[in-house]
Amino acid sequence: AYGTSEARLGKLIKGQRDAWIIASKVGEEFVDGRSVFDFSAAHTRVSVERSLQRLNTDRLDIVLVHSDGDDAHILNHLGTLNILKTLKNEGKIRAIGFSPKTEAGAIQALHTSDVLMLTLNLREQKMLGVIAQAHTQGVGVLVKKGLQSGSLASDDRGASATGAEPIETSLRFLFGQPEVSSVVIGTINPAHLRSNVASALRVLSRIL
C-alpha cells in the first residue's frame, strides 16, 4: 500500500485484516504531484502513523525505506531504520526493510533489515548475489520491477526462443529463484491485474 491506495485498501480489508499481509513505504512523499524525500525520524514516525490510520489497522506487516538513490547516506547518517526498529518494538510494525538503488546499499542493509526489496528481471540481474546472501542470513526478498515496469517485449531473453508469453517467462524466472519471497507487480488497470494474477497462478502451479 502506498499513498491514496492505503485509504482504498483500508476499506477493502475491513473485517478481514488477518487475511492480508500489508506492506508500505516511508521516505517518499508526493506534494502537488512532485516527488519529495524526507528520511528524518520525525517524518518517518508521522508517515507510519498516517498509514495505520488510512488502513484502519493497528499494525503494518512490512515497512520499507524507499531510497532516493543515496543509499549510503540514508543508512549511515539518517537513522531511518532505527526509528522503524523503535516502531517495531512498539508493535506497530512486524518487519522492517530497505528498498535500495545500489548493490552496495543492498549489501549494507542486509545487516539491519528483515526484508529487502530488490530489482530483478530477465534483463537486470545484478542483485542475484545479494539475494543469495539475504537467503543465507534469513532476510526476506521482495522483487520489484520484475516485469520491467511494464516494458516487457517479445524479444526478452528466453521469450522469443521458446515462443512463450513474455510475462509468464519472466514470472517463471522470478519464482524459480528459491530465495525470492514475493514479487511486487504494480498496475492501475484491473484487466492487467487479473491477467497477471492468472499468469502467476499458472506458473506457480507448474513450480510447486
Q: Which ranges hold each PLM region?
A:
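N-terminal binding-site loop/beta-alpha segment at the start of enzyme catalytic domains
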Residues: 1-20
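Beta/alpha (TIM)-barrel catalytic core signal, keyed to glycine-rich beta->alpha loops juxtaposed to Asp/Glu
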Residues: 2, 12, 67-208
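Alpha-helical scaffolding within the catalytic cores
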Residues: 7-10, 47-50, 125-129
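A short, structured active-site edge motif that brings together acidic residues
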Residues: 19-31, 65-66
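Short acidic, glycine/proline-rich loop/turn micro-motifs
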Residues: 32-35, 154-156
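Active-site pocket-shaping loop/turn-to-helix segments
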Residues: 33-45
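CE4/NodB-like, metal-dependent polysaccharide N-deacetylase domain
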Residues: 43-66, 86-90
